[in-house]
Amino acid sequence: MKKIAQGIVRFRKLILTVAFLLLIPSAIGAVATRINYDILTYLPQDLDSMIGEVALEDDFHLASTGMITVEGLPTNELIAMKKDIEAVPGVMQTFWLSDVIDPSIPTEMLPADVQQFMFGKNDSTMLIVRFDAPSASDETMNAVSQIETLLRKDCFFGGMSVILQDTKALVNQEMPFYILIAVGASLLVLFLSLESTITPLLFMLGLLFPIAYNFGTNIFLGQISYITEALATVLQLGVTMDFSIFLLHRYQEEKELRSNNEEAMVSAICKTMTSISASSLTTIAGFLALCAMRLTLGRDIGIVMAKGVALGVICTVVVLPALILSFDRLVEKYKHRTIIPKLTKLSYFVSSHAAPIVAIFILVLVPFIVAQSKTDVYYTLFDSLPQDLVGIVGTNKLGEDFGMTTSHFILVHDDLTATQVSDLCDEINDVDGITQVVSLDSITGPGFDTSLVPDSVMEILQSGGYKLILANSSYKTGTDAINGQLDQMIRLIKAVDPEGVITGEGAMTKDLIEVADVDFKNVNVWSILAVLVIIAISFKSISIPVLLVASIEAAIAINMGIPYFTGTELPFIASIVIGTIQLGATVDYSILMTTRYHEERVFGRTPKEAAQQSLEHCSQSILTSGLTFFAATVGVAAISKMELLKSICLLISRGALISMVVILVVLPAALMLCDWIIRHTTLKWMVPESANAKKSEKE
């Protein structure tokens, strides 16, 4: 490692040149990486709802649709608007009554099902827009944007395709502000906590490289989710900042011991790499645990963030040293007083009251452990967006005028008789909450010659070996009511056609709930196991990993229990990923504290003295890192209009503070009280490592 460090110091100008040049392909890769705005596409492909979704897309071209509610518009204007919409690139068809019959025919002469489906309250009718490509495709989103410019007054555009376009527009609008607020808030904390005025700017410049490389290398994944895109910069900044802080502190220490700055940096690089190897591996392992999710959104976030941490470590020991040495004179020239002190008084208090602190903490923890499992969770994208968006208003209008709060798409084989399908429609219509059921057979009736049905209708209701039944529900997606309704409908469908499926946002969200419940357990287990193993290997201990993980898991329990007491509803993805993110991001604090405690014990101090010294000397680093992470994420939470991102960032920011307090107050007390257990369950706990250190330094 020493030879590598010497090479980094010697060729620092070349390293900086290469680092800046690599920003060019990174920018190209970042721009070329597609962003996916549809969470439901991350569901496992073997679920019935996803099988049905594929059939809707491939056979009926209905997976990607939009509904336009038109109120009080004269027929001639409506037909003119319909033609304009059909001319938009990406639109396959705009379906209305005029595609079936002469619109001059009185509506009273139409079948009751058609009247109910096509006409609603407030003198309204409905246009169905079918797109060529999937809802989350760029082609469909561009088409939606164009259609919005063609709508007349009192026209409301709703459906998943429109909501996804709204999501894209909102994320693109807010993303620059997320980055600005995260960088600005982090800089503020760093200016207040570091002596040099130049160092925070170098840190931000140093973090530019791994963040840019991370986004650029996402091109190899093909696409990432908008959630990953929105969180990656903020998380990477917050998670890897402590690596930079650690390198700086080591360099400042070594400068006092070495004859010149280059030697000091070589030593700082070696010691930093040794120190952050365990903490970075635990962070990476925590993020990779998200890959255990069946919902592949977890793999998306996990891979991007694990890659980001790995790149952050590399840039910390390769690029940042080159930056610091290049600007060392300015770093030394411009200095100011800091306001984040060493917590000396707190360190003496904690070491003198260890037992009461741990006992009180356990008592306080119990209600939060109980509460975290009772926190309400929501699963719909609809609920996480501002309610004044075009797609939200339009979708609400569908429910208001047509009773289409949720639409179910039922696919049964086309060898079922007209009578069987009509009977099934009648049974589904009797299910609580179903407002309307439409199928080809329910419209035409048994014995009707389907060759007389217009092709525009046939290709919507029968295609690819399937018959389509559309059932509208008054229940909201993601609720217990609609999930019970779906269970009842599935039983009715399977009784007639064992291979029949039900899909649509309601069915897919129900599957999402079931998958998420399993994922929550799997991710927690795998992240805890991975971190336990890495810490156990690093410290050669059985008890230390249990103690450190328990301290962070306690902080997580408090964080996730607070929403229950405040009556806050969380997005489902937050309940899955927050534990992993908080564990991976803040376990570094506990490793730093424990490493210092170990050093003090080896030096010959008593457990009480070691606890006091470790808290006093680690407090500034932990406070700086924790407050930086808090500032970056709470800033995003404060400005985001998307409830999903706001909730995740608020939980992360609060989690950083809670973990920081637990590590600064509870962990030193716990280490002191468990010292006997640690000594007897840790290999060579009290043996000085100076010989090993000298050996590695020669190597």
Predicted regions and their residues:
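Structured non-transmembrane domains adjacent to transmembrane bundles in polytopic membrane proteins
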Residues: 44-164, 376-544, 550-569
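Membrane-embedded transmembrane helical bundles of large multi-pass transporters/channels
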Residues: 1-35, 41, 91, 135-379, ...
